[in-house]
């Protein structure tokens, strides 16, 4: 089993020449490779895409076999991938998914990091995060709009819809956390983001997600204070450890206007640098003595959360951004760790109730013009959604494409299938140079059970019921998505989430149009269904308005 290969540089093909037998198999091939593009992945030489150890394939041997199999896959065959390893090809039918993926799934009693890490070391499992192992990661852009929507809503609730002259304090500039600085600036606030690894600060500077870098609190605060005084938002990455810097900032009397965190606290061994340790020591010891690393990291997380609670008690709006740090702190003895809320129940759930979530697409041509043309089509089809238009304008101006050009925008039930059909028609007419793939994050309204994140504090107490993502995956398979994935542990770590993903290809054919209409209606409809079942009036009204047939819910 080979997991480190510094000689490999993976980039997807572009243009219209196929190396697989159809666009339905060329698409997953290119998107797998795109996940490992050096401008996309965090550690591509180790197959790590983002989120600690979220991988695209189990090892390099498995990667090679997946590539070989996708190239020979027939139009009526389906490839099965088990935790990053291709295990079977079976005859199905042309409207069935070409790939079915299951990553990191464990029987609940054994769903712990300790057991998973043992399997991982033996080469029997792979952590897929959410979009790493499901081959639809598009770089940091993939989380920017969701983060932006959260920060905008925080501004609405706490500062009369105006974040000018305000600043956000956070930590973590990995593949997900790296979206925070740009999202904050887009929302009108300055951002100070703490990050312990210089390489991550450098990557966010290089890709335009971060404006400045600093090495001391004083240096960072001087930049923040100047930007707030001028009401010209900018972002600064501060090199350091959040468990050390947050308590010190509180002690000094520094008070941000908003506070959150996106360190990779979901993975105590690979995701969080213990206080007082160097990065080199951390990397060396997590291979040699992972239990000691986890113990030290968890103790540091408790310190981190206590500091967040101190800021909250001082009047700073504080929110958990879904990395499970509160749970770790509670397990470490911080009894009131959950005193500050998660971002979904606090700010995002009304969107989920309408099936609104992170719709995304990528241009297989590799040509940015294809994305700009689809941006214009979104505006044309949704002329009254001025908030979305503003987002698309900002995205074009501020977001650098990583790997294949792609776009993220939050739209919901009734709009997703219209956009998919329109994109398919653009391919058919030759307005786009090649097909597009349409997918989403697993963080969506009907595709995840995560009691400390997406399904925290559900009205009916059904936070931990994971039937819903299973039903979502089954329905997307039956509806004809091009590839479907079912994962465990994404975002919040082992034992705390189950979630599903789907991707569908718009290749300009009539067959694709039929699949797109089914999948892109049914997928968000499961989110409305799930929230209607939990008793949310917004979801119940949406279900009635859209004519959903929910016999055990609407009666």
From Swiss-Prot:
Pfam families membership: Urocanase, Urocanase_C, Urocanase_N
Keywords for this protein: Cytoplasm, Histidine metabolism, Lyase, NAD
Reactions catalysed according to its record: 4-imidazolone-5-propanoate = trans-urocanate + H2O
Ranges in a coiled coil: none
MF-aspect GO terms: urocanate hydratase activity
Required co-factors: NAD(+)
EC top class, as a word: lyase
Lineage: superkingdom: Bacteria
Chief localisation class: cytoplasm
GO terms for biological process, alphabetical: L-histidine catabolic process to glutamate and formamide; L-histidine catabolic process to glutamate and formate
The protein's annotated pathway: Amino-acid degradation; L-histidine degradation into L-glutamate; N-formimidoyl-L-glutamate from L-histidine: step 2/3
PROSITE patterns linked to this entry: UROCANASE (PS01233)
Location of this chain's protein in the cell: Cytoplasm
Residues annotated as binding NAD(+): 51-52, 129, 175-177, 195, 200, 241-242, 262-266, 272-273, 321, 491
InterPro entries assigned: Urocanase, Urocanase-like, Urocanase_C, Urocanase_central_sf, Urocanase_CS, Urocanase_N, Urocanase_Rossmann-like, Urocanase_sf
Cofactor note: Binds 1 NAD(+) per subunit.
Protein EC: 4.2.1.49
Cellular component GO terms held in the UniProt record: cytoplasm
Active-site annotation: 409
Family of the protein in this entry: Belongs to the urocanase family.
Biological role: Catalyzes the conversion of urocanate to 4-imidazolone-5-propionate.
Name of this protein: Urocanate hydratase
Native source organism of the sequence: Rhizorhabdus wittichii (strain DSM 6014 / CCUG 31198 / JCM 15750 / NBRC 105917 / EY 4224 / RW1)
């Amino acid at each position: 089993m080979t997991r480190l290969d510094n000689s490999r540089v993976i980039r997807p093909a572009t243009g219209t020449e196929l190396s697989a037998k159809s666009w339905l198999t060329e698409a997953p091939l290119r998107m797998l490779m795109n996940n490992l593009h050096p401008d996309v992945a965090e550690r591509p030489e180790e197959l790590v895409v983002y989120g600690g150890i979220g991988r695209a394939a189990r090892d390099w041997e498995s990667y090679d076999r997946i590539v070989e199999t996708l190239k020979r896959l027939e139009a009526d065959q389906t490839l099965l991938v088990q935790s990053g390893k291709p295990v079977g090809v079976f005859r199905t039918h042309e409207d069935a998914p070409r790939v079915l993926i299951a990553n990191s799934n464990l029987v609940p009693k054994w769903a712990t990091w300790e057991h998973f890490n043992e399997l991982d070391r033996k080469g029997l499992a792979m952590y897929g995060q959410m979009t790493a192992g499901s081959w639809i990661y598009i770089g940091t852009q993939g989380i920017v709009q969701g983060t932006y929507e959260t920060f905008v809503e925080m501004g609405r609730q706490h500062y009369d819809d105006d974040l000018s002259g305000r600043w956000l304090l956070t930590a973590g500039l990995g593949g997900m956390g790296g979206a925070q600085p740009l999202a904050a600036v887009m929302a009108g606030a300055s951002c100070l983001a703490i990050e312990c690894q210089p390489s991550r600060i450098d990557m966010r500077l290089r890709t335009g997600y971060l404006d400045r870098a600093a090495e001391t609190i004083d240096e960072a605060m001087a930049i923040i204070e100047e930007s707030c005084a001028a009401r010209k938002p900018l972002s600064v990455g501060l090199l350091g450890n959040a468990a050390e810097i947050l308590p010190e900032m509180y002690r000094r009397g520094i008070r941000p206007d908003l506070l959150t965190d996106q360190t990779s606290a979901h993975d105590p061994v690979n995701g969080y640098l213990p206080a007082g340790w160097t990065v080199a020591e951390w990397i060396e010891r997590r291979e040699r003595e992972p239990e000691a690393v986890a113990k030290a990291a968890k103790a540091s997380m408790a310190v981190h959360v206590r500091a967040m609670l101190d800021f909250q008690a001082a009047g700073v709006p504080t929110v958990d951004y879904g990395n499970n740090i509160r749970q770790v702190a509670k397990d470490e003895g911080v009894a009131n760790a959950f005193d500050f809320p998660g971002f979904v129940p606090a700010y995002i759930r009304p969107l989920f109730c309408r099936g609104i979530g992170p719709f995304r697409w990528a241009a297989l041509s590799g040509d940015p013009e294809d994305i700009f043309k689809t941006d214009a089509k979104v505006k044309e089809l949704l002329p009254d959604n001025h908030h979305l238009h503003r987002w698309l304008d900002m995205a074009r101006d501020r977001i650098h494409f990583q790997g294949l050009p792609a776009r993220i925008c939050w739209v919901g039930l009734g709009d997703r299938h219209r956009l998919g059909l329109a994109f398919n028609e653009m391919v058919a007419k030759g307005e786009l140079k090649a097909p597009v793939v349409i997918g989403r994050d697993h963080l969506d309204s009907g595709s995840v059970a995560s009691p400390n994140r997406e399904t925290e504090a559900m009205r009916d107490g059904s936070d931990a019921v994971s039937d819903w993502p299973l039903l979502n995956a089954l329905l997307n398979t039956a509806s004809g998505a091009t590839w479907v994935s079912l994962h465990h542990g994404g975002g919040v770590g082992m034992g705390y989430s189950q979630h599903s993903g789907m991707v569908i290809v718009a290749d300009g054919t009539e067959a694709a149009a039929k699949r797109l209409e089914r999948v892109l209606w049914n997928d968000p409809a499961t989110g409305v269904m799930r929230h209607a079942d939990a008793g949310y009036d917004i979801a119940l009204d949406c279900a009635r308005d859209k004519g959903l047939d929910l016999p055990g819910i609407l009666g």
